[in-house]
Amino acid sequence: MTKSNNDFEDIARWRMDFCREFGVTINDEEYFIDKVQTYGYREIIYQYLDHFIEGNSEKVRPNTTFEEIYAFYQLDQRLKNEALIDLQLFEQTFKAALIDVIELYVAQLKAKKFNFYQESRLKLEDLLKEKYVMQTGRVIRRGELRSRIRRIKENYLEPFDGYNYLYSNEITTWVLIKEMSFGVACNFFFLLHHKQQAIILKRVFKNDLSLADFEKVIESMRYFRNRAAHNYSLLIIKNSDDEFLYNTVYKSLLRLKNQEPARRMKSNFKDIINNYLEEYPKEKNYLPSLDQLKLSNLLKDDAYENGCIDWNARG
């Protein structure tokens, strides 16, 4: 049995009553109903009401309006979207290095393994280790990666018109890595041999980075992206090191040789936060991004020959 519009209106009234019990002022009931039905009552209230609770009280700060809570929700959305773009720039840099190193490695392996007249196809075992055990205990296996590669090969998109004709319907390393999710590309990296891993890390990061440190960087980025993908709050969430997630992302981006993502994050976060504070100046005393999050510091700071590899070969 489907709910009628009257049922949903009743639910909206109950929700307004609940918010008012916490001391939230609702000046425009239609605005409240529109926003909670459009974006989700729990998305806005459950995730962001705590920010406005006063001390150990069960009430929000005096004169807190629903409009303020919704604006705080929107602030997190804007910061989240900006951070995701900056992480995407990092992903592009990482994948570019991964592609170049793999193509060179494939060419070197082919030169050693085959003579000029042999069909020069490599197996996945020629390129990757059987498994890699991360510090968290998670095991990355070559066999699992092979199944991902097979699905990509069966379903990849043409990057430009005529690609399949040019490459005789063979997937190149470029398209293979391009089609991988960030997580799968990282798994591919961890299964590479140490020499190739070291070359990639040196190309991507400013200072020497150990594999263990890289694991931490990647895991923090994955956690951030997973929370963002499911629209969980990020402004008031800390990682296992008691650090707010936006700050973790920014610190990771500062380690890159390509400083465009960090510069962009700093500049755009500054604009987003300042625009928010212009409308809600009293939030300067409460906003985590200017206090515990320590983004106030942020506001102050100023190819190779294509290798041919049989990605579906057994081994």
Predicted regions and their residues:
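Extended intrinsically disordered or low-complexity regions, especially N/C-terminal cytosolic tails and loops
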Residues: 1-223, 235-315
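Acidic/aromatic/glycine-rich contiguous surface patches that form carbohydrate-binding/processing clefts
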Residues: 231
